[in-house]
């Protein structure tokens, strides 16, 4: 299965277009996506983006809640209601709307970060800060896991 991997920093051109990294375009093409599905991240000051696989995962998440339930309505509004399908031009560029750019504080550069089934679009300095925090949390998690592996709980009765 093809995945979005690696990080790429790209510059917006004078018309506000940005090129999707070629490896990401390849994954989108294999996914059969005819555009780029993009919405403000629910967790970060960034944008979540992807193709049909991402849309399918969102559909499954929303459909896991009972019809007309409050949770389903809120998820649908948060994910479908704020999403945009961006047209990819023949050169592999998209135009981010002002709403999307405002959510992620994007001005002249963006960083594309592969997350496997989707990718995230960040303002590069915000990404740098996020990665520093995430790396620290992963180190702490690794230490906690290592401590448990070294000192397994006793199984004696």
From Swiss-Prot:
It is found in: Cytoplasm, Nucleoid. GO terms for biological process: negative regulation of DNA-templated transcription initiation. Keywords: Cytoplasm, DNA-binding, Repeat, Transcription, Transcription regulation. Residues 7-52, 83-126 form the SpoVT-AbrB domain. InterPro entries: MraZ (IPR003444), MraZ_C (IPR035644), MraZ_dom (IPR020603), MraZ_N (IPR035642), MraZ_sf (IPR038619), SpoVT-AbrB_dom (IPR007159), SpoVT-AbrB_sf (IPR037914). GO terms for cellular component: cytoplasm; nucleoid. One of its GO terms (molecular function) is transcription cis-regulatory region binding. PANTHER family: TRANSCRIPTIONAL REGULATOR MRAZ. Forms oligomers. HAMAP family: MraZ (MF_01008). Belongs to the MraZ family. This is Transcriptional regulator MraZ. It comes from Xanthobacter autotrophicus (strain ATCC BAA-1158 / Py2). The lineage of its organism: Bacteria, Pseudomonadati, Pseudomonadota, Alphaproteobacteria, Hyphomicrobiales. The gene is mraZ.
């Amino acid at each position: 299965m093809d995945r979005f991997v690696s990080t790429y920093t790209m510059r917006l051109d004078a018309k506000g277009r940005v090129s999707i990294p070629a490896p990401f375009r390849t994954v989108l093409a294999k996914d059969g996506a005819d555009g780029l599905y993009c919405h403000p991240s629910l967790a970060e000051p960034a944008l979540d983006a992807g193709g049909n696989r991402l849309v399918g995962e969102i559909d499954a998440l929303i459909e896991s809640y009972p019809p007309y339930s409050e949770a389903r309505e809120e998820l649908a509004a948060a994910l479908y209601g704020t999403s945009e399908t961006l047209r990819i031009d023949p050169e592999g560029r998209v135009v981010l709307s002002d709403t999307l750019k405002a959510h992620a504080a994007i001005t002249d550069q963006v960083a594309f970060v592969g997350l496997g089934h989707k990718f995230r679009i960040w303002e590069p300095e915000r990404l740098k800060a996020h990665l520093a925090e995430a790396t620290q949390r992963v180190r702490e998690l690794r230490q906690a896991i290592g401590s448990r592996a070294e000192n397994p709980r006793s199984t004696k009765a």
